[in-house]
């Protein structure tokens, strides 16, 4: 992983027993606000991505946030269990750009009220990875909204 060397994710991190935390500032477009992002990675676990600033719940103005996990609030960037993300994949080439894409669609949702980033919502029939491939759909941000991955 080359988080420091990638201009999209240049920031600072903390290494600890069993994992690390990485924080960086990003903006999905030149006209967008800046976001402070934190990635937490633990051994044998999927990365967890948080927006530390600004408060996306406050930005939503009381509306339910789309495509997040709760407790604690973190971004849903891909559909767990489909192997769209694997521990051997580089965070700077997967999670970082997927986070920018999520933020792009989030800002659009703030204005339009419609989530255009794709993905799965609770209650929808689960699509398999093979089914999505057969349909030509490969979205990094597909997820089911829930408490845990």
Q: Residue ranges of each PLM-predicted region?
A:
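Charge-rich, low-complexity N-terminal segments
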Residues: 1-21
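Compact alpha/beta protein-protein interaction domains typified by the UBC
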Residues: 14-80, 89-90
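Domain-scale recognition of soluble eukaryotic interaction modules
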Residues: 53-149
């Amino acid at each position: 992983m080359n988080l420091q060397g990638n201009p999209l994710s240049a920031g600072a991190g903390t290494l600890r027993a069993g994992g690390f935390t990485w924080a960086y500032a990003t903006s999905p477009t030149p006209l967008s606000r800046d976001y402070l992002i934190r990635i937490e990675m633990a051994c044998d676990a999927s990365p967890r991505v948080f927006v530390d600033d600004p408060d996306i719940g406050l930005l939503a103005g009381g509306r339910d946030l789309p495509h997040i996990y709760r407790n604690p609030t973190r971004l849903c960037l891909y559909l767990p269990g489909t192997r769209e993300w694997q521990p051997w994949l580089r965070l700077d080439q997967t999670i970082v750009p997927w986070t920018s894409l999520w933020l792009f669609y989030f800002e659009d949702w703030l204005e339009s009220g419609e989530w255009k980033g794709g993905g799965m919502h609770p209650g929808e029939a689960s699509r398999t990875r093979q089914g999505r491939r057969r349909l030509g759909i490969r979205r990094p941000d597909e997820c089911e909204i829930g408490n845990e991955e």
